[in-house]
Amino acid sequence: MARSHGERLKTRHKFNKDLRARGLSPVSKAVQEFEVGQKVHIDIDPSVHKGMPYRRFQGLTGEILGQAGRAWFVGISDGGKKKTVIARSQHLKPQKNSA
């Protein structure tokens, strides 16, 4: 019978932090606010387990659709399909304006 290997399967290198960046992330990442329509990058912080999106969405860029409690809804395009990722603010980075 097949077994599940957990949500963090095959993330040994993907979720690694640099040696000097290890430990908890700063509080400012937890309290950052976003506006609906703002572009954000999904950058998973492995030291924060709550609100962590699935590993497939690491590195993708999406648009904030809304908020529910402490989590944010991020709309992304995955292989031509529109999907909604639910993640906490520790796993999101605002996109810098290129203009």
Swiss-Prot record:
A Pfam family it matches: Ribosomal_L21e
GO MF annotations in UniProt: structural constituent of ribosome
Superkingdom of origin: Archaea
Annotated GO biological process: translation
InterPro entries, sorted: Ribosomal_eL21 (IPR001147), Ribosomal_eL21_arc (IPR022856), Ribosomal_eL21_CS (IPR018259), Ribosomal_eL21_sf (IPR036948), Translation_prot_SH3-like_sf (IPR008991)
Gene Ontology terms: cellular component: ribonucleoprotein complex; ribosome
Keywords: Ribonucleoprotein, Ribosomal protein
Family: Belongs to the eukaryotic ribosomal protein eL21 family.
Protein name: Large ribosomal subunit protein eL21
Origin species: Methanocella arvoryzae (strain DSM 22066 / NBRC 105507 / MRE50)
Record gene name: rpl21e
